[in-house]
Regions:
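Bacterial Sec-dependent N-terminal signal peptides
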Residues: 1-27, 195
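Flexible, solvent-exposed loop segments that connect beta-strands
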Residues: 44-51, 79-111, 136-150, 172-174, ...
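Hydrophobic, lipid-facing positions within transmembrane beta-strands of outer-membrane proteins
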Residues: 36, 55-61, 110-116, 134, ...
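Membrane-embedded beta-strand positions of outer-membrane beta-barrel proteins
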Residues: 36-40, 74-78, 116-118, 128-132, ...
Length: 202
């Protein structure tokens, strides 16, 4: 089922690329230089894990590479994502934490995602984006938190890019996103808001 969802997500994203290119205005790319972004995010978990790790957050670094004469950019991203327990954690929960006892309030599940994807500007500075890649559990005892120390991860979102700095070459992106690290027992997923501060590299 998760593979079907990922394929559906890819089809939707490719359809958006095709539609955006068909409606492309040649003068649009003048404010889209190569950019390096530094981001922060905050959200809440969804699915079964939300009963144990209710809050989520993270920091990220992203490289945005605009395609010439196109409203599409290629994204490369990495960072640190964490889920914080809100009221205790039962080690017997669906494969998480087997044989290691019980986790208490404030316990943190930590991951490093490495992803690539596309960012599309269908209308002016409004954008949609989607990424996929690998998520690495970096807790000292990864089996306390996951079945898979390394797992597939995907995310998608939409937002608005606010111009900043000289000629608007820098920007601040504000977006709403969904992220999912599917695995047996439910995995880790979240809905959150993200702010990325982008700096033009040329």
């Amino acid at each position: 089922m998760n593979i079907k969802k990922a394929l559906f997500f890819i089809v939707i994203l490719l359809g958006a690329v095709y539609r955006a290119n068909a409606q492309y205005n040649p003068g649009y790319s003048s404010f889209r230089p190569l950019k390096l972004g530094i981001g922060i995010s905050s959200g809440f978990s969804t699915g079964p894990v939300s009963d144990y790790f209710g809050e989520a957050g993270g920091i990220s670094v992203a490289l945005e590479v605009p395609l010439k004469h196109s409203p599409v950019s290629v994204l490369f991203s990495t960072g640190y994502t964490f889920y914080v327990s809100g009221g205790g954690y039962d080690a017997g929960f669906d494969g998480y934490g087997f044989d290691y006892g019980t986790y208490y309030q404030g316990d943190i599940a930590s991951f490093i995602p490495v992803e690539a994807g596309l960012k599309i500007f269908p209308v002016s500075r409004f954008f949609i984006e989607g990424l996929a890649g690998a998520s690495f559990n970096v807790n000292s005892y990864s089996s306390d938190y996951t079945y898979k120390p390394t797992a597939f991860i995907y995310s998608f979102g939409a937002g608005y890019s606010f111009p900043m700095g000289f000629r608007g070459r820098n920007s601040t992106d504000l977006s709403l996103f969904y992220e999912n690290r599917p695995e047996p027992g439910g995995g880790y997923s979240q809905v959150g808001v993200k702010a990325i501060f982008n700096f033009a590299l040329h």
